[in-house]
From Swiss-Prot:
Protein name from the UniProt record: Conserved oligomeric Golgi complex subunit 2
Coiled coil: none
Gene designation per UniProt: COG2
Cellular compartments annotated: Golgi apparatus membrane
GO BP terms in the entry: cytoplasm to vacuole targeting by the Cvt pathway; endoplasmic reticulum to Golgi vesicle-mediated transport; intra-Golgi vesicle-mediated transport; macroautophagy; pexophagy; retrograde transport, vesicle recycling within Golgi
InterPro entries associated with the record: COG2_C, COG_su2_N
UniProt entry tagged with the keyword S-adenosyl-L-methionine: no
Major site of localization recorded for this protein: Golgi
A single GO cellular-component term on record: Golgi membrane
Membrane-topology descriptor: Peripheral membrane protein
Keywords, ordered alphabetically: Golgi apparatus, Membrane, Protein transport, Transport
Assembly and interaction partners: Component of the conserved oligomeric Golgi (COG or Sec34/Sec35) complex which consists of eight different proteins COG1-COG8. The COG complex interacts with the Rab GTPase YPT1, the Glogi SNAREs GOS1, SEC22, SED5, VTI1 and YKT6 and the COPI coatomer subunit gamma SEC21.
Domain of life: Eukaryota
Pfam family, one: COG2_N
Organism of derivation: Saccharomyces cerevisiae (strain ATCC 204508 / S288c) (Baker's yeast)
Amino acid sequence: MDFLNDDELDLDLPVTAEISKELFATEIEKYRESETNGTDVDNFDVDRFLVQKNFHYLPLDSLIRDLSGLSQKMVQTLLEQIRSNYDDYLTFSNTYTDEENETLINLEKTQSDLQKFMTQLDHLIKDDISNTQEIIKDVLEYLKKLDEIYGSLRNHSQLTEALSLGKRLSKSLHEMCGIEPLEEEICSGLIEQLYKLITASRRILESCADSNSPYIHHLRNDYQDLLQEFQISLKILTEKCLENPSSLQNLSLTLVSIIKTA
C-alpha cells in the first residue's frame, strides 16, 4: 500500500479561468438573475467563486497581478472611450446628475456590492488561501507518515514470521545433530534455509535500528536466541565433519559456503 503512488498522481492539470472583463460580466448577469429571483446578493460566496474558476491553483502574486492589470486596463479603456466620444460621454453623465435618479441609486448599490466583494476577496487572498496551503501541507505529511507506519508494520509482520519459522527449523536441526547416522542431506537443507531466514531477519532489524519500542526489543532478543542456537548446531556439525570428512563431504561444503558468505 503506497499512498503516494506515482500512478495515482497522474491527473489532468486544472485549468484556471482567464481573468477578464467577460468573466466578471458573467457574474454581473448572475447578480441580476439573483435579484429577479429575490435572492440576496450579500450571500455571494467568494470562496466558491474562486474555487469554481480554479483560481486557488494560482500563486497569490499572479492572482493579485492579474486583477490589478484588469483594473488598470478597464480604467484605460474608459479613458480612451471618453476621449473619443466626449460629447456622448457628457450626455451619458447627465443622466446621473439627478440625486433621485433610479440608475444612480442602482449604480451606488452596485458599487457597495462590489466593495463587499473586494473585501471578501482580500480576506480570501490574505487568510483563507494561506490556511488552505497549510492544510494541504499537513495532509501530505500525514500521508507520508502513514506510508512509513505501514512499511514498519509490514517489516514487523515479516520479521515475526521469519523468526517463528526459524525457531522451528532450528529445533529440527538441533535434534538432527543427535541422530546417528547423521542425515547429511536434511541437515544441509536445514542449514541453508536457516541461514536465509537469519540473514533476512537481521536486515529487517537493521532497518528498525532507530526504534526503541518494547516490541522491537522483544524481536531482537528472539533473533539473538535463534542465532545462538544456530551457531551451537553449526559447531556440533562442524566437529562431526572434522571427525569423518570423507563420509560428510556435502555437509562440509554447505558449512564452508555458509562461512564464506557470513
